[in-house]
Each structure stands twice: as C-alpha cells, then as structure tokens.
Curated annotation (Swiss-Prot):
PTM summary: Phosphorylated at Ser-653 by PRKCI. Phosphorylation is enhanced during cell polarization induced by calcium. Phosphorylation may occur during the cell-cell contact-induced cell polarization and may contribute to the segregation of LLGL2 from the PRKCI/aPKC and PARD6B/Par-6 complex.
UniProt keyword Oxidoreductase present: no
Record PTM Phosphoserine, positions in chain: 653, 971, 1022
One GO MF term: PDZ domain binding
Protein name stated in the entry: LLGL scribble cell polarity complex component 2
Entry GO terms, CC: cytosol; intracellular membrane-bounded organelle
Upper lineage: Eukaryota, Metazoa, Chordata, Craniata, Vertebrata
Disulfide linkage: none
SMART domains xrefs: WD40
Location of this chain's protein in the cell: Cytoplasm
Residue ranges of the region described as Disordered: 654-678, 940-981
Length: 1027
C-alpha cells in the first residue's frame, strides 16, 4: 500500500522549484502567418503588420517588437498610424475600428487597445451605407475620415470614436458641385481613395470607383475641382507640392492631373499604359515621388499584360529611364515607400521600397544603382522551403561562430549595404549571454543556420546539399540570363520558393558538433552526408558508400521511391560546410535517427529497417543491424505507396481502440473460459468497429503491445556513450539504439588510439539487447555517471567546458519510452526505478531533452532534469535519476499535432515549436534563461528622418536582441498566462513529416483539418506578457 500513499509536502523543495522553474511563452520568430494589412509610421519609423487571425505586430529597430491581439477573430484589413503620435487604428473585416496606443509603463512601452467602434447608419439603411473602404487619419490627430461603399465620407472624432454627423460628406452633396454633363454618369459608388493635401490640411482628395476624383474643401464644404476618367479608379495620390494628382486604373493605365483653381474639369497631362498596348491587369496602387535630381520615381503595383503575365505578382519601379518589375513568388498584400518624413521638405527623395507579400517581407534599396534588396534582421521567411526538421545548439564557441558568419557573408554579396531603414524605438535588453544556433532542415535539401541568441532570429548561413546529387531540374543548367531588351523587365526578388526540385532531397535529421565543426545531415531517400567546415571554396569528389540494411534478409522487396543519383566526379563547393562522404542506405527509406561522435569520428544512422555505424575518418562501414520484424511489411512499402496499406492501417487502428475499450472494463478473468469470453468480445468489437464510430475516450493503463504491430523495427533514437557495458572494471565506447517496438540494442565499440586511428579499423560487437515489456517506442536513451550527471558531449571535456565524468561510481541507464521512464544499473542492466507517465490519461511522450536549470537566486546552483513533451501538448520536468515529476505546464494545443512534432528543446530549459508554417514560438521553462523583447518608443523623442546611409557590411548591427531576467516563479498547474501569442494555425509541413508523424501517432489523426485557434487574452498586451 505504500505506493498509493501521497508523499509529504516539502516547503524547502517547493521554494527551490520556484527558483528553478517558470513557464513563459516569450517571442515569436519568423514571418507572420497569413498577413493581411501593412502600415508604417514615418515619424516613429515603425512598421505594422496585421494578420487574418486578428493579430497586430509592430517592428522597429532590431529587438523592438510588439504584438496585440484583437478580441474578435477577424482579419485585419487596414492599419493606419495617427500622424506624429504613438497610436494606430485598425479596420477589421467585421467593419469594426480599433484604436491602439503605445504607452510607457515601468520604463518599457506596451501596446494596448484603447477602444473600439463600429460605424452605424440610420435605421433601415443598407449595410453598404456604412461599410468602410478607406480610412484617412487627419494630420490634426483628432479626426478620422471614413470612406464607405455608398460613396459617403463620415467623420469620426478621436479619442472616443464620436461620429460628427454634421460634417459627413454625402455623395449627393458632392453631386451638386459637378457640372451638368458629369451628373448624368454613375460617377460614385464606393470610395477608393482618401488623401489629405500635402500642404493644406483643409483639403482632401476623394476618389470614387467609377473614375471620379474630387478635391473637397473641408471648411467651405464644397468641391474645389474634379477629375473624371473613363476607366474605373483603383487608387490616387498627391504629388508632394500638391500641384499634381496621380491616378491608377483598372485597365493598367495611370494618369497625371494638374491641380488648378482655374480649370474645373482638366484633361490629364499624361496618360500611359506602361505594359500596353495589349490588355493589362489593373494598377492597384501608385506613388509619384519627386527627387532633388529632378527625375521622379513612379512606383506601382500590377499593370502586367493580362495574357502572358497575368499570374505574376509584380511591383514596378520607374526612374531616370530605368524600369524594373520586381517579381514576387507570392501574392503582394501591400507596399509602401520610405521617403523624407518632414512634410515641409521640398522633395520626397525615396530611399526604400517595403513590400509585404503573402509569404515574406522584401525591402528594396532605392538609393543604390540596380536597386538591390536589403537583408532582413527579423521577419525572416523561415518557410522559404517547407521546414522538415530542426536542431538547436547552445553556447557556440566564438571561433566556429565567426567562421559560420564569414561563410554566410559571402552568400550575401547581392544584398545592399544600406543600414536597416525601419529603426524606430530603442531596445533596452542587454546583449545575449551566449551564442545559440537554430538549424532548420528544408524540403529542398537545404539547411539554414539561424542566430537564435535573442529576440531576432537572423539568418547566418545557408547550406545546400543539392549539388551532391543529380536532379531532374539542375539549377546550374537552367539559369537563363534575361536579356536587356526583354519586356517586361522582370526581376525575381525574395527568398520564398515553395517548389522543390525533388522531394527526396528533404532534410530529416541534423547533428552538429560545435567543437570540431563536423556536421551530419540525413534525408528522405536514405542519404546521410558528413560535412566539414572549410573557410575556402574547394572542388573535390564526394566518396560514396552503400549501407545495405537488409543484407541478411530474404524475400523483402522495397516498393518505395528510388535513391538519389549521386553526381560523379569532382564537385565545386563554396566556402562553408562541404560534404566529403555520402552514406546511402538501402532500401532508401527516410532516415529516422542520427548521431555523430566527432571525437571517435563515427556517425550512426537509423531507418525503419535498421541502423548502421560508419567510420568517416577511414571512410568505411563498421556494421549494420537489421531490426525488421517478419510482420513489418509496411516498412518496405515506402512513403510513395503508403496508400496501398490503408486497409491494414485501419484494421490496426481499430485493434488499438478495441484494446483501449476492453482494458477499461473489468479485469479479464483467468482460465480458458475467460480467454474464450475475451476473444468473443474482441471479435465482436472488430466486426462492429466501422459502424460504431462514437468511441469512448482513450483511458488505458500501460499494456504490452503486440510484436506484430507495424514498424516495430523503426529506429527512433541513437546514442553514443563511454560507459560500463560488459563489466564494472572497464568502460568502453558504446552505441545504443532504441526502436519503435520497445527494443534497446547496445553495441560495444573498440576505437583504436589516436596514433593508430587511421590504420586500425573500428570494431563493434553487440553486447546487450533489452526488450521493454510494454513494447512502447523508445524515444530517448541517456547514461548517467557516478554523480548522476549526464555524460558530457564529445570533446566538451577536452575544451575544458565540462568536468570529466565520474567513472568510479556505478553508471545508470535511463530509457525513455512513449509510456514510461525506466532506470537500469550498468553493466548488469537490472531495473532500478520507473515512472509510468500514461497511467490513466492516454498521454505519450513525443519529445524529451536534457536541460540544465539554473537558480535565479544562487548563481552557482543548478540541476539537470528531463524536459518532456507529450502528445497532449503538456510539458513536464522530471528529475534524474529519481524520476520525480517536478512541474507540469500546458504548452501546445493537443490538436496541433504538427506543432508537437516540430518541438525542440535547448540545453538550458528553452524550446521552440512551429505555430504555423512560417513561425516558431519560443518558450522558456527556466527562471534564469528568458529571452523576450524589452523596448521603448517615445514620440517626444522622434528621430530625425534622414535617409539611411550606405556603409560597409550588411548594416545588421544587432545592438540588443534579448532579455534575460529573473521573475516570480509559477506554481505547478498555475502557469503564467501566455501573452501576445498566436497559436492560430497548424504546421502545413512537407509530406515527409506528415508521413512520419502519422506513423508515430496511434490515433491516426487527420492532417487535413486546419482549425485556427487563438489564446484568449485581454485587450491590454505588453511586449512580453498579458495583463
């Protein structure tokens, strides 16, 4: 009965927990999912992006970030900053207006929603009468002019959103000021443009969709002049001196109209169709910007020839005889031009073009000849190719960091040297305490290295593995330079490229040794590459070795995709990580596990068929081990023919549900009679399974799984350790492997000493085989030394960055399966402790990592614990080696299967997971390590808005990027409410990740359902937490 007794409450331990553990969701890295609106404040130099899920994100200088979330789950249609103020107005698709303010509290700025408003019409009026289409914040900062679908312009006073009905500009009133010939045409309908006169705040421009443009005198309530076009109006804007109006139209034309009090109905000075004479698409927005040199900039969106280029997403820039149509790979949401902010200035002098596309943000330098792009310090398009895996490395040595940055800088020669132009606000966060890397593998065979040290996730270097293989579309053979005379003058910009040359190139596993510079990557078609960092470009052949994982098996036939064909002969590689050996697994199945030991120069790899060990110093295979069970036919079908096993998959799913339901009833009686009754129940449940879809929730105790379940040989984890494997007197190198069927294999390795390492071969011999009784998949293996501390990383002791492991006391083996944790003594491998995670909750371990938790009070105190993520989205911290649960937090929605599958833990109690295809959510479990924005925006100290200078380097001077603070801890189960967090989407990842995850998920959840979801937070949102 002792095991049923609750342990006593220990106040000292509870206080220590508060010093060690605290859950926070801190910052979102990447590009906002499904952007829908763009805004910019010239006085604050802050950019705003709205999304379809109702989020508003503000960005200034690197490290200056804010986020707000509307209570309503509606798309943001427009964002407008109030001139000269720290306020902005948003328009949602439910026709509601919201006023936001940046207010200083506690020395930092917070984004708060002040009030909301919906324009109401008279009783019985049609909804279009008050449907807002255009918003003009007046320069006074006290009035909003709202154009509507009915053609009326309403005036709303701020603050308070009070409608001034006596100042409404009705379409009937405007009609009275038009000449007789214009009154007979349907010149109104909706308002398409509202612009204040750049020199006279008493005049506004009103543009109607039917082609009428009116200059309205606010004081005299009269039309000063009007302009009538024969084409439908899309947009209109002033020239800086107010003497010229530029309009753009639905036929792909734009016109210039002189503004004069003498002429009431002038003809356009100039009308042109830039990409005519054939029918063109509409020009939806246009800027006409003056310069000191005298030649203006004309920048417009759309207008491409409808027949040949109607599917292109282009923004054209015309200046001084040069014309370029910037071609984006995703739909353009909106754009703006950064120019001289002082209204009294004589010229616009534009210096940057900011384009918000559906999948990325692009900034073009308009000062430098050729108009090159500007490198982004944040808002990176993480999903330029679909993310398939991720890997985090903490505390990178300075030398390796500098070498990676140097290799990356050579890839950035096409970027402008302009300093980042959106530099509003001040980051108050201290410099990050260490250098961290986040590596992401992608579907197109690339690996991207990101600076994850602080708030800004910045791309440092991109590695491509494509050159190692021959693909159907070789980029080196298909690059066709565009001639100078080609029309239209298209130029591809941006990094988003959703198309992959070959899905087999996808990266599935990454392992980087930060001490030696060795990198191992593995892919979808069984390819394993070992790479070494080289500071110079080189040309060499990549040695190829085949690892046949089925060499001892007969009668198996692989039905999946073929292997990738390696490129023969020497290959040119740029500076950076260069591959020197390729290990090709046969069959070419997805590589499911990878481990690299740079001190022993060994790399281990596993698939659904087995695992192998390769000596990359001698370029030879050490051994392969087939883990297939005779029933693992599904493992041979491969991802491209998985649909063939649908019937078998459904049958196995119902068997699992049947066992779950039966186990929740009374215990099965013993003897033949009980077995017969149980068999009858099983048969009946299987027959009626398809009809009875309303099943009880899965609540089961741990039970042994059948050895005939599919994918029992699926290798889930690989682990190197120098420990006591054969006897307690001698320790030796070893390799451990855990499979989907609950089997753990241990191989003792004989690695020759350094002086004979190149001559003598590495030898391996199987020493142990452990079969877990419940046969749950093994997701983690760890060896603890005599002091119960995890063994250090390879070369960590040699670099004096870790103490030598205690080899005097007895070592312990920790095996983490999906359903329980178990500690074994070594070398006898006798069970010592265990923790059942899934007793009655149906939860299973999805991710596990070892983290060091430092105390926020005592600098020299810390503990090593396991960070565990379950399929329910909960994160638990479990002590080692006593396996005592410490805290538990709810982190990810249980429906977000792909978000759970993408989670990665760091060595210091932080983590990342994908909340959308383009965004990582960062969270922290530690009180000591917390990266969050802390910034200040002060309107009274607005910067002088000179154009950014062009200097040497990339201009990405990261003055601050994170904040490490100590804060009040949270008790278990009462975690801090997540603040401005967008858990609004699931990962729409590559088919490879879907296939692997669907294999691992017992309940066969559907990937097709995408249910947007938001965390309910208050209106008051700070840049780190909700209040």
């Amino acid at each position: 009965m002792r095991r049923f007794l609750r342990t006593g409450h220990d106040p000292a331990r509870e206080r220590l927990k508060r010093d060690l553990f605290q859950f926070n969701k801190t910052v979102e890295h990447g590009f906002p999912h499904q952007p829908s609106a763009l805004g910019y404040s010239p006085s604050l130099r802050i950019l705003a992006i709205g999304t379809r899920s109702g989020a508003v994100k503000l960005y200034g200088a690197p490290g200056v970030e804010f986020m707000g979330l509307h209570k309503e789950n509606n798309a943001v249609l427009q964002i407008h900053f109030l001139p000269g103020q720290c306020q902005l107005v948003t328009l949602l698709d439910d026709n509601s207006l919201h006023l936001w303010s940046l207010k200083v509290k506690g020395g930092v700025s917070e984004l708060q929603e002040e009030e909301s408003f919906t324009l109401r019409g008279p009783p019985g009026a049609a909804p279009s009468a008050t449907q807002v289409t255009e918003i003009l914040p007046h320069s006074s900062g006290e009035l909003l002019y709202l154009g509507t679908e009915s053609g009326n312009v309403f005036v709303v006073q701020l603050p308070g959103f009070r409608t001034l009905h006596d100042r409404t500009i009705c379409s009937d009133e405007v009609l009275q000021w038009l000449p007789e010939e214009a009154r007979h045409r349907r010149v109104f309908e909706m308002v398409e443009a509202l612009q204040e006169h750049p020199r006279d705040p008493n005049q506004i421009l009103i543009g109607y969709s039917r082609g009428l443009v009116v200059i309205w005198d606010l004081q005299g309530s009269r039309a000063l002049s009007h302009f009538l076009s024969s084409q439908q109006l899309e947009n209109a804007s002033w020239q800086r001196d107010g003497c010229l109006i530029v309009t753009c139209h639905s036929d792909g034309s734009h016109c210039q109209w002189p503004v004069s009090s003498d002429t009431q109905n002038p003809e356009p000075l100039r009308s042109s169709i830039p990409y005519g004479p054939f029918p063109c698409k509409a020009i939806t927005k246009i800027f006409w910007l003056t310069t000191r040199q005298g030649l203006p900039f004309t920048i417009f969106q759309g207008g491409m020839p409808r027949a040949s280029y109607g599917d292109r997403h282009c923004i054209s820039v015309v200046h001084n005889g040069q014309q370029t149509a910037f071609d984006f790979t995703s739909r353009v949401i909106d754009f703006t031009v950064l120019s001289e902010a002082d209204p009294a200035a004589a010229f616009d002098d534009p210096y940057a073009l900011v384009v918000l596309a559906e999948e990325e943000l692009v900034v073009i330098d308009l000062q430098t000849p050729g108009w090159p792009p500007v490198q982004l310090p944040y808002l990176a398009s993480l999903h330029c190719s679909a993310i398939t895996c991720s890997h985090h490395v903490s505390n990178i040595p300075l030398k390796l960091w500098e070498r990676i940055i140097a290799a990356g800088s050579r890839q950035n020669s096409h970027f402008s040297t302009m300093e980042w132009p959106i530099d509003g606000g001040t980051s108050l966060a201290p410099p990050p305490p260490q250098r961290d890397l986040l590596l992401t593998g992608h579907e197109d065979g690339t690996v991207r290295f990101w600076d994850a040290s602080g708030v800004c996730l910045r791309l440092l270097y991109k590695l491509s593995t494509v050159r190692v293989f021959l693909t159907d579309t070789d980029p080196s053979e298909n690059l066709i330079a565009q001639g100078e005379d080609e029309w239209p003058p298209l130029r591809k910009v941006g990094s988003f490229d959703p198309y992959s040359d070959d899905p087999r190139l996808g990266i599935q596993k990454i392992f980087l040794c930060k001490y030696s510079g060795y990198l191992a990557v593995a892919g979808t078609a069984g390819q394993v590459l070992v790479l070494e960092l080289n500071d110079e470009a080189a040309e060499h052949a990549v040695e190829q070795v085949e690892a046949d994982l089925l060499q001892d098996q007969e009668g198996y036939r692989w039905k999946g995709h073929e292997r990738l064909a390696a490129r023969p002969g020497p290959v040119c590689f740029e500076a950076g990580f260069q591959p020197f050996v390729l290990v090709q697994c046969q069959p070419p199945a997805v590589v499911t596990s990878l481990a690299l030991h740079s001190e022993w120069r060994l790399v281990a790899f596993g698939t659904s068929h087995g695992f192998g060990l390769f000596d990359h110093q001698q370029r030879r295979q050490v051994f392969v081990k087939c883990t297939l069970h005779p029933s693992d036919q599904l493992a041979l079908e491969g991802p491209l023919s998985r649909v063939k096993s649908l019937k078998k998959s459904l049958r196995q799913s119902f068997r699992r549900m049947r066992r779950s339901r039966v186990s929740s009833h009374k215990r099965r009686p013993g003897g033949p009679t009980g077995e017969a009754q149980a068999q009858a129940v099983n048969i009946k449940a299987e027959r009626t399974g398809l009809q009875n879809m309303e099943l009880a929730p899965v609540q089961r105790k741990i039970e042994a799984r059948s050895a005939e379940d599919s994918f029992t040989g699926f290798v889930r984890t690989l682990y190197f350790a120098d420990t006591y494997l054969r006897d307690s007197s001698r320790h030796c190198p070893s390799l451990w492997a855990g499979t989907n069927g609950g089997t753990v294999y241990a191989f003792s390795l004989r690695v020759p000493p350094a002086e004979r390492r190149t001559d003598e071969p590495v030898r391996a011999e199987q020493a142990k085989e452990i079969q877990l009784m419940h046969r749950a998949p093994v997701v983690g293996i760890l060896v603890l030394d005599g002091h119960n501390v995890p063994l250090p990383e390879p070369l960590e002791v040699a670099h004096d960055l870790s103490k030598s492991p205690d080899m005097q006391g007895s070592h312990q083996l920790l095996v983490v399966s999906e359903e329980q944790f178990k500690v074994f003594t070594l070398p006898k491998v006798s069970a010592k402790l265990k923790l059942k995670l899934t007793a009655l909750e149906g939860s299973r371990v999805r991710r596990v990592g070892v983290a060091h938790f430092g105390s926020c009070r005592a600098e020299d105190y810390g503990e090593h614990h396991l960070a565990v993520l379950t399929n329910l989205g909960d994160i638990q911290v479990v002590s080692m080696p006593l396996l005592k649960p410490q805290v538990r937090y709810s982190c990810i929605r249980r429906e977000d299967v792909s978000g759970i599958a993408s989670c990665v833990f760091t060595k210091y109690g932080q983590g990342f997971y994908l909340i959308s295809p383009s965004e990582f959510e960062r969270f922290s479990l530690s009180t000591k390590w917390l990266v969050e924005p802390r910034c200040l925006v002060d309107s009274t100290k607005a910067k002088k808005h000179n154009r950014p200078s062009n200097g040497n380097g990339t201009g990405l001077k990261m003055t601050s990027s994170g904040h490490v603070r100590n804060s009040k801890s949270q008790s278990d189960g009462d975690e801090k409410k997540p603040g401005p967090v967008m858990e609004h989407a699931l990962l729409n990842d590559a088919w490879v990740l879907k296939e692997i995850q669907s294999t691992l998920e017992g309940d066969r959840r559907s990937y097709g359902n995408w249910h947007p979801h938001r965390v309910a937070v208050g209106c008051r949102l700070s840049n780190g937490e909700a209040e």
